[in-house]
Amino acid sequence: MLIKNVKVFTKDKKFKNGAIALSGDKIKAVYTEANMPDSDLEETIDGNGAYAIPGLIDLHFHGCKGDDFCDGTKEAIARIAEYEASIGVTAIAPATMTLPVEELEHILEVAVEYKKENTDKRRADLLGINMEGPFISPAKKGAQDERNIIPCNVEICERFLKASDGLVKFIGIAPEESEEAIDFIKSVKGKVNVSLAHTNADYKTAKAAFEAGANHAVHLYNAMPPFSHRAPGVVGAVYDCKHVM
C-alpha cells in the first residue's frame, strides 16, 4: 500500500511532499518527490496534503469528548481511546484524579479489564495509567479534592499496582508532605515511575526526592512553587537532574 500526497518528515528535519509505502502493518519506505515510486503499481490512499507523522503518545490527560477516565467504565475508556486515535494520538496513559483509595482501585481494575478485552485497532493503545493523586499537597491541589489527599504510603501504592496489574506507570507525590517520602521512593522506584506532582516542595526537598529515584515532574511550573533565582524550587531541581523527564 502507498499513502501518497502527504508531507513527510525527512532526515534534514524538514517536511517535504512525499509518500509512505506500507507492507502489512510496517513502514517499508518513505519517499519524497525526488524518488517517488510508480503509484500505479500499488494500492494507494490519497493523504490530501496532510502531515504524516508517527503516532503521538499522551502521558497526561484526564479525558475528552465528555468522558473522563475516572468515570470508571470500559465504555468511557473506549470512547476516549477512539477519539484520541482520530486526532493522531496512538497511545495513551490517562491520569487519575485524587479520589478515595477504594474508588481508585475500582477505576484501575476496570482499565485492566478494558485492556484485556479490547481488540479495536481504531482506538489508541492503553499503554499505562498516570496516577496524579492522592499523594499530593493540599497547598498545591489545584482542582483536586482536598478531602481525599493523603501522604505517600507504600502499602497503598502496592494496592494500586496490584489493582492495575502493572498498568500504573507513573505515581505522583508531594515529598514535603511525608517524612517517609524518601523511603517511599526507594521502595517503589523499581516498580513504577515516581513523579513530583502538585507539590509545594522547596529545592532541597525536590532534589533529595530526585536523587532517591523520582524521575518525572508533572506539568512543570504548574501546581508547584514559582521559580526564582533565590528559591529555585522544584523547577530548579528538575533542571539540575539530568535523569528527570
Which stretches of residues belong to each language-model region?
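Active-site core of metal-dependent hydrolases
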Residues: K162-M245
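Divalent metal-coordination and catalytic microenvironments
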Residues: V6, I20, D25, G49, ...
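Divalent metal-dependent hydrolysis catalytic cores, especially in the metallo-beta-lactamase
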Residues: H62, A78-I107, R123-S137, S164-E176, ...
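Active-site loop-to-helix "anion-binding N-cap" substructures in soluble metabolic enzymes
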Residues: G66-G72, S86-G88, A93-E103, A223-A231, ...
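Histidine-rich, glycine-flanked metal-binding segment
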Residues: L2, V8-I53
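Conserved phosphate-binding/catalytic loop of the ribokinase/pfkB sugar-kinase fold
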Residues: S137-K162
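Charged helix-capping and loop-helix junction motifs
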Residues: T73-A76, I107-V110, N153-E155, H229-V235
